[in-house]
Each structure stands twice: as C-alpha cells, then as structure tokens.
A protein has these predicted regions:
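N-terminal beta-rich core of secreted/periplasmic extracellular enzymes
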Residues: 1-115
C-alpha cells in the first residue's frame, strides 16, 4: 500500500487537485487510483461529460428525500435503506465519492453555503 512517504514531492502535490471537475487523479506507478466524484446531497449526480458543469447534463438518478426529511421520520431502517440504495447507484455509475449530504454546514442568508 502506498503511503505519503512513498511519493515524490511532485506526486504528493498532484493529489491536491483533480484531473477535472469530477475526478480525483491517481498517481501513476502506485496503487493510488483515479476516482470519480459526484455532487448531490439527495443522491447521485454523475455528469455525462467530464468537462460539462451544466446540471441538466447528468446521468438519470433517483432523487432521495433530503437528510432533514429522513431524520424527521426517526426511522433508522429506512435511512439505512436509502443509504444502501445511494451506494448501489454509486457502484453502478463507478462513483467513489458522493459530495453530500450537507451536515452541519454554515449557512448564511447572503451566501447560502458560502460558495
């Protein structure tokens, strides 16, 4: 298994940016692989074209209830089922990381989630 100590400075620095908006780059010659990431706090939003940021240009996916809705049911089994279903969709789309749900993030009326 590759550790940070095994990387050159250049290789380690390359891990601080992605290969594009939706992919973390790997390091050639190591076991650090490239990974696809997606956005979507209510499920998966895998983009069809890596360079396209148009929200309508994504693979079809299920829109699950938001975390606040699921938590208000107090139904732990249902919440686990939703998590498993999101995981199955991620595996189907070869997605390694889902950026969401938003949990304890700073919100402000002037800046939403500050981006």
């Amino acid at each position: 298994m590759t550790t940070p100590a095994d990387l050159t400075l250049s290789q380690a620095a390359s891990l601080t940016s992605g290969s594009d908006a939706w992919h973390l780059q790997g390091v050639e010659g190591t076991d650090i692989q490239a990974h696809m990431i997606t956005d979507g706090p209510h499920g998966l939003r895998a983009m069809i074209d890596d360079g396209n940021m148009d929200l309508s240009h994504s693979h079809p996916a299920t829109c699950f209830p938001p975390a606040v809705g699921l938590s208000s049911t107090w139904n732990e089994d249902l919440t686990r089922e939703v998590g498993a279903a999101i995981g199955e969709e991620a595996i189907d789309q070869s997605v390694a990381v889902i950026l969401g749900p938003g949990l304890n993030i700073k919100r402000h009326p002037y800046g939403g989630r500050n981006f």
